[in-house]
Amino acid sequence: MGWLDEAARIEMVDHSSIKKHEPPSSNNINWLDATGEKTSTNELTADFEKHFDGGPASIRVKLHRPMATFSLTVLFGPSGAGKSTTLRCLAGLDRPDRGIIRFGDEIWFDAERNIFLPPQQRNIGYLFQDYALFPHLTVRQNVAYGLRKFSAPLRRQRIEEITSLLEIGGLEHRFPRQLSGGQQQRVALARTLVCRPRLLLLDEPLSALDAPTRHQLRRQLRHWLVQLQISTLLVTHDRSEALAFGDHLALFHAGRVCQNGPVQEVFAAPADVNAARIVGVDTIAQGRIVNISDGLATVEVGQTQLVALAPPAGAAIGSEVYICIHAEGVTLEVGAALPETSARNRLVGRIRAVDREGPIVRLNLDCGFPLKALITNQAYENMGLHEWSDVVALIKATAIHVIMSGPSSREGKIINRSRYGQI
C-alpha cells in the first residue's frame, strides 16, 4: 500500500452519525469532535508488542497518557528505536501481534478478543513525514478531502476556519508542486486538523524543512495545537525539537520505552546510561562514591573528586556510579584570581580539542577525566583561549546527575535495529 492510500485511509473518517447542521455565525473556531459534540475526557492506554519478519527485532510499547486537557507527548529516540511503528500501530496502519490499545472507552486493538478498529473509525489525525498531499488536487481540495460527507455550508466554514488559522488562505487554488516546503507542511496540517481529530499523531513533521523554516514553524505549530486543544503525540529524534514542543516525553531505546516523564525532567535526570546517551548528555564518566553528607555525594572520578546531589535511593559509600554533566552546565574561567561563586566544583584543566559551530564553541577538556564544555564564540575570543590553554571549570553540584551503576547502565552499547526497517 502506497502513502497516498494510507493518507486516504486516515482522512476517511466515518461520518455516518454526523449531524448535517448549518454552521453558527461566529468567527471563532468551535472546536468539536467529528460528531459535532464536545470532546469527552479521554485516556490513551497502549500496551502492545510488534514483531518483524527477517530477524529478531521487535518493539514492546507501554504508554498511558491522560488526554483530558491539551498535552503534547514526544516519542524521542534514535532512528530505528520504535517511534514511527508505535504511531502506525496507534493509527491502525500496522497491526500489533499482542496486547491492547484503548482510547477513552473505545478499544482500538485487543489481540485476545480479536478486535482491530480500522484507521477510518479511530478519528485520529496523522501527519506523515512527507506530508502525503494529493498532487492532482488543489490546496482547497486537499484540505476538504476528509469533509466530503459534510453539508456544503459546514465544509465551507471548516475550510475557512483552518486556512485562516494556518495562514494559507491565499494558496487555495495552487497545486502542491507550486508550494514551498513550509507551505506544504501547513496544507498537510490543515487537511489533518479540519476533520477535528480527537488525537493527533505527528511523525517528524518538520524534518524535511530547511533550518530557518523549521525554526519558525516549530513555534507556530505548538501555538496552533494549544489554540485548538488537540492532544498530540509527536515523533522526533531532534533534541531541540523535543524540548521546544513537548510537555511529556517517552524515551525509546531498542524497541522499548526505557523512561518517561516531563520533558525537562527526563533530559535533566536520565534513568540510566543508555537514556543519558540518547538525550545527549555530553559527559558521562564512571566513578565511585567516597562520601555522602547532607544530601550531597562526593564522587571520585579518575583523578578528581566531584560534589553532586546524592542519588535518591540505594547509594552508599563505595557504590559504583556514573556522573552525567551537560556541557552548558560547565562555566570556564582563566587566570589565578578567580571570583567566588556558588559552584562547589572548581576543576583545573586543559583544553584538548576545539570544535567551532558558528556562534558556539565546544571544548574537550582534561580535568583529571574527559569533560566537555560549551561557550559562545565571543567568550572564547575574549578569554584568549586556544587548544592547550589552561582553564578552571566551575560546575554546580545541581548540574551533576548521578546514576547508580547497574545492568542497563553497564550495557553501554546502543542497539540499532534499522536494518530491519524504520520501527
Where are these regions (language model features)?
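Conserved ABC transporter NBD signature motif
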Residues: 15, 30, 34, 99-111
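Helix-to-loop junction immediately C-terminal to a conserved catalytic motif
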Residues: 91
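The feature captures the beta-strand-to-loop junction immediately N-terminal to the Walker
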Residues: 76-78
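ABC ATPase nucleotide-binding domain helices that frame the ATP-binding cleft
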Residues: 84-87, 187
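ABC nucleotide-binding domain signature
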Residues: 73-74, 116-118, 122-132, 233
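ABC ATPase nucleotide-binding domains
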Residues: 123-125, 136-274
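A short, flexible loop at the N-terminus of ABC-type nucleotide-binding domains that lies
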Residues: 38, 43-69, 112-116, 151, ...
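Glycine/charge-rich catalytic "coupling/switch" loops of P-loop NTPases
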Residues: 29, 268, 305-355, 372-423
